[in-house]
Amino acid sequence: YNQPPVIADEIIDEFSAYKDIVTNHVADTSLLIANAIKNKKTILFEGAQGTLLDIDHGTYPFVTSSNTSSGNAAIGSGIGPKNLDKIVGVTKAYISRVGSGPFITEQKNEIGDYLIEKGAEFGVVTGRRRRCGWLDLISLKYSVRVNSLTELFITKLDVLSGLEELKLCVGYKDNGVTITAVSYTHLRAHETLSH
């Protein structure tokens, strides 16, 4: 690689100095959380990315490399799922997606442009425009089920305030048949469906 060789002793010496700094901050997190729960403390877990990006429950292969659904809070923290007594989902009043993948309600028109501009739908790092479209209640219903949501917060309602007409997807059409629930294990369906 045209780089000088790594000298193990130098690396060990450098990182050994960090041991004393880090040691006091290392603990069995699952035990700390379990004790906090036992002592009636409020514990908040925060997830990132949407359900449809979940490696197991998303629109594979257009997913991330991890679990984004609420069950991962229990898995990642080492507490049992029965300790998750409130699961709050958050969605926008419209849908956005980064990159490729199925997007049945995508608006590749002036509506999409409006949502992108008014909703500031640009990637934080890249500045790339996100794809935007109408709220898809079929996907939302799936997300509610997969995550066992107890509450749902809807954000960015103000973005829709300048539109004369609002649309919601309440079903998919597949060869003239209306579908109101979809299993995301069948990606082929997303490629042929319309709203």
Predicted regions and their residues:
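Internal alpha/beta core interface subdomains
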Residues: 1-32, 43
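Short coil/turn segments at secondary-structure boundaries
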Residues: 5-9, 48, 88, 100-107, ...
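Long, low-complexity N-terminal extensions
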Residues: 14, 75-77, 176
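Short, hydrophobic/aliphatic alpha-helical segments
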Residues: 29-53, 112-126
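Conserved phosphate/anionic-ligand binding catalytic regions in large, soluble enzymes, centered on
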Residues: 42-77, 95-98, 124-148, 154, ...
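A structural-propensity feature for long, helix-poor, extended segments
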Residues: 80-131, 162-184
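Conserved small/polar residues in nucleotide/adenosyl-binding loops
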Residues: 185-192
